From Swiss-Prot:
Enzyme Commission no: 2.7.11.30
Glycosylation sites: 102
Organism whose genome encodes this protein: Bos taurus
BP-aspect Gene Ontology terms: BMP signaling pathway; cell differentiation; cellular response to growth factor stimulus; determination of left/right symmetry; dorsal/ventral pattern formation; germ cell development; heart development; in utero embryonic development
Protein name as it appears in the record: Activin receptor type-1
Main function: Bone morphogenetic protein (BMP) type I receptor that is involved in a wide variety of biological processes, including bone, heart, cartilage, nervous, and reproductive system development and regulation. As a type I receptor, forms heterotetrameric receptor complexes with the type II receptors AMHR2, ACVR2A ors ACVR2B. Upon binding of ligands such as BMP7 or BMP9 to the heteromeric complexes, type II receptors transphosphorylate ACVR1 intracellular domain. In turn, ACVR1 kinase domain is activated and subsequently phosphorylates SMAD1/5/8 proteins that transduce the signal.
Modified residues (Phosphoserine): 501
Gene3D superfamilies recorded: CD59, Phosphorylase Kinase, domain 1, Transferase(Phosphotransferase) domain 1
Signal sequence interval, chain numbering: 1-20
Cofactor annotation: Mg(2+); Mn(2+)
CDD domains: STKc_ACVR1_ALK1 (cd14142), TFP_LU_ECD_ALK2 (cd23535)
Record topology, Cytoplasmic segments: 147-509
Keywords for this protein: ATP-binding, Glycoprotein, Kinase, Magnesium, Manganese, Membrane, Metal-binding, Nucleotide-binding, Phosphoprotein, Receptor, Serine/threonine-protein kinase, Signal, Transferase, Transmembrane, Transmembrane helix
Gene: ACVR1
Keyword Endoplasmic reticulum annotated: no
Amino acid sequence: MVDGVMILPVLVMIAFPFPSMEDEKPKVNPKLYMCVCEGLSCGDEAHCEGQQCFSSLSINDGFHVYQKGCFQVYEQGKMTCKTPPSPGQAVECCQGDWCNRNITAQLPTKGKSFPGTQNFHLEVGLIILSVVFAVCLLACLLGVALRKFKRRNQERLNPRDVEYGTIEGLITTNVGDSTLADLLDHSCTSGSGSGLPFLVQRTVARQITLLECVGKGRYGEVWRGSWQGENVAVKIFSSRDEKSWFRETELYNTVMLRHENILGFIASDMTSRHSSTQLWLITHYHEMGSLYDYLQLTTLDTVSCLRIVLSIASGLAHLHIEIFGTQGKPAIAHRDLKSKNILVKKNGQCCIADLGLAVMHSQSTNQLDVGNNPRVGTKRYMAPEVLDETIQVDCFDSYKRVDIWAFGLVLWEVARRMVSNGIVEDYKPPFYDVVPNDPSFEDMRKVVCVDQQRPNIPNRWFSDPTLTSLAKLMKECWYQNPSARLTALRIKKTLTKIDNSLDKLKTDC
């Protein structure tokens, strides 16, 4: 019987031989080729650089959509290039400078067979014959061998593997079924690690079912959607806010932004529904909604208050700092930080969303990438230098200081909802008592620049050590002189110190 068990893997290896090492062996110092780039994913660029070039043709709502581009890493295009053409999509790949210039992918026609299709059918036939051969040889041994294998496997299985077989927020499935967790994990270990390959993004986007609208605004709508049983958020931009969609898509696909306090990006796509073009941005779904909505319904204790503000500061510090190396990122300023652009997660932390106005800066090139978006930030959260138009628009630090001003206002919103001595204030937006619900630019300029007013600090805060520390911190975010304001990293360290002192106080008690 032991012999039978030993024979089983040998015969399976005969039936399903491993790919040759020649095919799988990674290339040392792979050569990069210049490729023609045409289509939505190219932006304003007419070329790109990668290890493989491609030309594709797909059918979208009855229209032929042609695209050309490159796979930065050979493995990215490996499966795509080997896939035989289908009636709805065909991809041709090549290696060499500008090799895809004169290549046009063609969809298969009746009676016409492609070499890739013939090889595919041949491989399938060989596999079927191998399987039949293996089954005939193993018919007598299979039952007992499988029974023994199952028994041994169950003895080794840790009960926790069954109980905790999910990743937070993303459902795991059987081997062979792609999940968001699989796709996102792969995106962090191949290519730039910044996002899914464009062809994968389009596949995910077209398999999503919209379930319910969870928010509306001037930018468009946010829907809860479903992809293979998993909840996702779908932000559908209005046509007038196309630049914001393009900016977020560009930023997420070129920058390593994976951080627990930055909203997780999944895919972006331009699709057609009800005879109109829709711009989709697909992200992780957080059912608790925005911080703005959360604070109106929920009061906070000291621990939950600090968890919220520290997580926001951590996300902002990650945006502001430049990280060097292959898994690095440029420094980024948000430019529209507010409680409506911050989402609350199940664990009580927050993540920063809406990067449609973001500005990027790289020290190595000293280039400031402001983007091409006519949209401006939210007037209620604008810093004095923005309102009086004295901001140095060619200096990246100026944009970071604008974020710090806005963070101070968000900190004030959160602190008002923290209960101390049984007292708590109702939720109110910043400057609620001196400007109307939808303040104009002039309204805010008079209050912030001319009168130099700041949000009111309630007296009860000074009887609570945590609120006293938070009040001091927010005041240091509101200096009229931008260069005097704290940095995001300093704010994060200060909040961590406040949090640690609270833990120490609990331990001493």
